Amino acid sequence: NGHGYYSAKRFFGKMFDRATLHGIPPIRFTGATLSEGSWHYQSIWNVGGGKNLYDVDTREWGSTTSQGKDLRDVTYANYFPVGMGGNFPINANSTVEQYEHIQAISVGLGTTYSLYLNQKDVESCPQKEAIFKVIRTWENARAANAFPRDKKKLLTKPEKNWRLLDGENKDTWILNELKDGKKVKSYILNRA
C-alpha cells in the first residue's frame, strides 16, 4: 500500500492480536530479508537453502557460493536465529549419522533448519525411526540449554562426528565424539 515497513508491522501486529483473541498459538514466520522492525514479527531469518549454505554430504559451507561462510558469522552471539533452509529432507538415502551431524552443526552455531517431510520419501527411509529419535534427543537437550559454550564450539567443526544419547537420569545427556564410528571422548551434559 506504499507505506513500507510501517504497514507491514501494523499488519502483523493486528494479525497476532487477532490470533490471540481466537486462541491460536503463536505464529512462526520466516523471511529472507532483515528489514527495519522485522524482528517484531519474524521468528527466524531464512537466508536460503541448498548447497549455498551447508552441504551435509561434503561437510562444507557454501559449496556453490559464499552464503554459508556468511551464515556462520551471522549466527554467533546473535539474538535473531538464522535458518539453514530446507536442505535436509528425509528420504531413502538419509542416515542417522547425517542427522547427528546436522543437529550438531545446528546446535553449535545456534541455527535452525526446515525439515521437509514427504510421506512417501520418509516411508522409504529404512532409518526413519532412528532419525526422528536423534532429532528429538538433540532438540530436548537444546531446549534444556544443556550445551555449554565450549561444547558448542566443538560441535561447529564439520570434520567431527557426534552421537548424543539420553543420560541415565532425567535432564542429562551423553555427548560422544566418534572417530571411525568408535567413541573417543564423552561429555556429560546437564539441564542448565
Model-derived regions, located:
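Active-site groove signature of glycoside hydrolases
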Residues: 1-3
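Active-site-proximal substrate-binding groove within the catalytic cores of carbohydrate-active enzymes
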Residues: 5-192
